[in-house]
């Protein structure tokens, strides 16, 4: 079986949670005889094809990005080519331009969509996008939510509950790097043995500003590990809250 994953970002340019989830799926499913491929956008497509963890990654040129939505003039042709050879197309939501490609390609293949996040911040743009979004979600065969709570709390998922299946994210512990004893001792000396740890892309919808507000007046160490569009904003927020 051949599965085509489609999302706006992927390794090696971006190492976020969605990218990790896609990579884990591609890697773990190899044992079941599934040949996974990933199509993504990149500002640098040299080379246009990569091998990562024994699966192929195809990169189309990123031509424009507006409100975290990447656009590409060349990706439609590549999507049609790869989708024609795929048995299943696996979309990763949200990415409004993906909806356009889905309908423009005219590919009649079984489709799965993993619903990673509601659209929270761009509410005005959501009003314009909503008709296309609902049509797109209606057209796919199955929608995957990562938890029962997410299915219950998302008004969008609630509209499509008949086709939603809950499948939690999974991570292979064998893929974890092994830290050196010296590195462990260094960080234990710096932050102690107990602390709150966040690891991931720094994005507005993850509520890290709420975490920083909750930390005021406490002596519990907080470690935020990651990068993303709100990194500078979070650093300023920590300074305003007098968190060092």
Regions found by a protein language model. Give the residues of each.
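Short hydrophobic "strand-cap" motifs at the C-terminus of beta-strands
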Residues: 6, 146, 167, 198-200, ...
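N-terminal strand-loop element at the rim of the active site
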Residues: 6-15, 21-70
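A conserved mid-protein helix/loop that constitutes part of the nucleotide-sugar donor-binding site
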Residues: 20, 194-217, 229-232
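A short, histidine- and acid-enriched strand-loop-helix "catalytic/donor-clamping" loop
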Residues: 67, 96-97, 111-126, 139-142
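An aromatic- and histidine-rich active-site surface loop
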Residues: 74-76, 88-108, 115, 120
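A short, active-site helix/loop in glycosyltransferases that binds the activated sugar's phosphate group
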Residues: 138-178
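A short helix/loop element that forms part of the nucleotide-sugar donor recognition site in Leloir-type
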Residues: 177-191
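Nucleotide-activated donor-binding/catalytic signature segment of Leloir-type glycosyltransferases, i.e.
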Residues: 224, 232-244
